[in-house]
Swiss-Prot record:
Swiss-Prot/TrEMBL cofactor(s): Mn(2+)
Species this protein is from: Yersinia pestis
Note describing how the cofactor binds: Binds 2 manganese ions per subunit.
An annotated Gene Ontology molecular function: metalloaminopeptidase activity
Protein name, as recorded: Probable cytosol aminopeptidase
Amino acid sequence: MEFSVKSGSPEKQRSACIVVGVFEPRRLSPIAEQLDKISDGYISALLRRGELEGKVGQTLLLHHVPNILSERILLIGCGKERELDERQYKQVIQKTINTLNDTGSMEAVCFLTELHVKGRNTYWKVRQAVETAKETLYTFDQLKSNKTEPRRPLRKMVFNVPTRRELTSGERAIQHGLAIASGIKAAKDLGNMPPNICNAAYLASQARQLADAFSTNTVTRVIGEQQMKELGMHAYLAVGHGSQNESLMSVIEYKGNPNKDAKPIVLVGKGLTFDSGGISIKPAEGMDEMKYDMCGAATVYGVMRVVAELQLPLNVVGVLAGCENMPGGRAYRPGDILTTMSGQTVEVLNTDAEGRLVLCDALTYVERFEPELVIDIATLTGACVVALGNHLTGLMSNHNPLAHELIGASEQAGDRAWRLPLGEEYYEQLDSNFADMANIGGRAGGAITAGCFLSRFTRKYSWAHLDIAGTAWRSGKNKGATGRPVALLSQFLLNRAGLNGDD
């Protein structure tokens, strides 16, 4: 799908469709008022007859409006004008895209980017429109025999901006939006792949392909089980012992900073390509969704794609910690004591608390990069879903400025996170009679004790942990990976690169 920006009057547009907003109760937006005036009150007359109230997502498609050059006008309800916020704006864009795609409008000029969204500028509105459009049209049908496609799908969208001065900002928003949407799609595609295809070797192949595509400043190294053993990554290795598939850690290094020696930002993604729970096996119901336990690694892959496509002036390292947790004769057991790469020992009380065992060794491994900061991303705990539901990503950090940066980026990107505490009281729940710590701390505060566990392996750098167990995928009728938090982390890196889109 092609996107562009322009600045022009609605009555002069010669297009298959013009999209304008209507507020409650039956109030025309400024652009709709212009069209109404040109058409001698045609639109307002329809509204007076009750054709459209203006509630969020309501639509009315008009054909051959008098004195208008475009074939059709799509009126879209935007709710109450003063209440139009980020969430409603994206809902309106989503409904617009679906309506245009379903009604055979192959191209359209959209004036919704001129609506006032409190605290948001043209860059934000255009970028969110691009990302939302791509999200709305996303399908995962690679493995289906019969693929369905609209007879006349939407192929071109032009976003109108109020003044010519804002064209540059709009064009930059499209560039960033397309790159982020591409990263989100890449993460979703990986997440949606079945575990018989997407194993640690598949993740490694994708990481290598990314480096090949951006070979001027990107390289990928893959660390196998023999090298992990030599490095002392016994916690990581233990998790994969029950699987026929080799554990592989893919390390993607991108050097975009003119100062090649600048300390990198490191992203570490949990990549459990299937999590049966191991010996502490999960219930059968919903176990198919445990293919999504690699969405942390998928996020890192998607973000690295965004970084490379935009050629951000940063040094960034992405780690995909690939592994599979299966029961078997070689599987690790409750009661085992593992020596981690850091030298700390862990008593295994539950083999289904495996993600932290993979991550703790990966977090120790990345010390060699002398990182500016490290962020790990993991579908780590069901407790985080209980605490925050499916709307907010859980955030924990040992560094307040980093936590504040990430929360700010999450608000900018519309990919929200919420900070949880790391208090000494929670650390005590991890005490073990037989090792330095246990791998679980009981039911109470489970998301926090998991973060506390990881923090014991991050004392040499600034660190943040994103628990995406509630936000990485949807269940039910619309089951599928969401691609979160690619947008959050991409925004964080754009901000770090000084490309945050502020006018």
